[in-house]
Amino acid sequence: VEHTVTELITGHNLVELGIRVAQGEALPLKQEDITWRGHSIQCRLNAEDPREFVPSPGRLWECHFPSGFGIRCDTHAHPGYEMPGCFDSLLAKLLVWGRDREDAIRRMKTALDETMITGVEHLIPLHRRIMDEEDFNNGDITIQYIDMHQELLG
């Protein structure tokens, strides 16, 4: 699980805690201090062809990422950014938090619809199709999910 997902459902900044421990501080909480609340989903918004997962280099002409309650977007992207064809194709990590899985899926659909990226191909259409897919909605997913649902690739 990505640290960002864990942070949204526990309320603890894991990176900050890791840095503090690395500096010699004692961990300021115990396992029993950690409670889980709600459900979180993260979509990696990569500059890639959503059918073949090959990089899509180019200039971002426009980009807008949603914000608000239950939404977190970690990004370095901005209009004019030159997405290289090598290295990591990640443009943003889009996360949502909801009271339960159904609420989180609903919020992610809205967040994906409110995200705008032009100038490069990206994975938003794939993520949107996944959010509508029955097995995903039912939580029936494995590491072979995409292999088992090739129709999602477009």
Model-derived features: where do they sit?
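ATP-dependent carboxylate activation and anion-phosphoryl transfer catalytic cores
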Residues: 1-154
